[in-house]
C-alpha cells in the first residue's frame, strides 16, 4: 500500500493554521507520532506547531497529562477530548488534537478491535469522532487515524475562521 507524503497529509490544516495565525499541539497514542510528523513536515511548521507527546502507555499518560477523572476509560470520545484539551492547555495553543485507539494487528487492552480509534480536536470549536477501519493492518490504520485527525482539525479550523 502506498501512503501520501507527510506534508500532503497535513497540508490543508497547516494552510488554515498559517492563514489564521493559530497554533496546535498534539497528544497521540496509536499513531505513534505520525500526526506530529505530518505537521512538522510542512515548511514553516514552527509558526503553528508548538509540540506534542506520544501517550502510548498509562505511564506515558501520567507523565504528560493531568490525572484523568475517575472512571474515564481510554479509547473513548471522552478520553480523546481529555487528551486534546489537556495538551492544548499545557502547551498554550489555540487547538489541541487527541488520538487514542488500537492500530493492530490485535485489539487494545481496553477491548477495542484493531482499526478502532477516536480522534478529537479541542479549540474554539471541539469535536470527537470514532473511526472503525475494520482492518488489522497496523501501518494502514496509523495513516487512517492520522488523516482523520488532521482532516478534523482542518474542518474545525475552517469553521472557526468564518
Q: Locations of the language-model features?
A:
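Short alpha-helical segments enriched in small residues
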Residues: 1-162
